[in-house]
Amino acid sequence: MNFLAHLHLATLADSSLLGNLMADFVRGNPEGQYSADVVAGIRMHRRVDVLTDTHPLVIQARHLFSNSYRRVAPITLDIIWDHFLSLNWDKLVPTYSLPAFIHHARSQIEPHLYYTPEKFQELNAFLWRQNWLIRYADLAFIADVLKGMARRHPRLSALSGSFQDIEQHYADFDALFWQFYPYMMEKAENKDFYCLPQ
């Protein structure tokens, strides 16, 4: 799961949006560094990641990638799930629009950035102003995201090429998303992520 999915699942679980979005920028035990609700959000994010990485449908999705790109498939999948969520937001969340959700999330996070990791603050400088979460619906933007990550992290250079597997198996990824993401939504609504190991 990437930024949009983590924020959405956090909302369904009544969990801290700040903690859920920031979790990848926090190393080790967050206890004592942040408030209890933010810590709970960080822990929820980590549980979502564990369940995502080990779920049979996600493992099935990884095998759609060619050998050259399978090593980076988990990262590419995180981004492609956000693509399908952004693209299909109105079907999954008919009660309020994606722009309204993003406005709400931003209002919950930006006032607290001053005490968050510097790299997280840098992310927020682009995430909201450049409308990433809305632009995820555009496959061309997904390609740009993967190229940018590959450029910034040479060890992950295969990310750029992994986009061709997205194009080749797009219908398969779409079908897997519709099996997997509603399941994750249900677990979030049932607060099940509080009961899973990190």
UniProtKB/Swiss-Prot annotation:
Coiled coil location: none
Recorded family membership: Belongs to the AcpH family.
Keyword set, alphabetical order: Fatty acid biosynthesis, Fatty acid metabolism, Hydrolase, Lipid biosynthesis, Lipid metabolism
Pfam families assigned to the protein according to its UniProt record, in alphabetical order: ACP_PD (PF04336)
Stated name of the protein: Acyl carrier protein phosphodiesterase
Originating species: Photorhabdus laumondii subsp. laumondii (strain DSM 15139 / CIP 105565 / TT01)
EC nos: 3.1.4.14
Annotated GO MF terms: [acyl-carrier-protein] phosphodiesterase activity
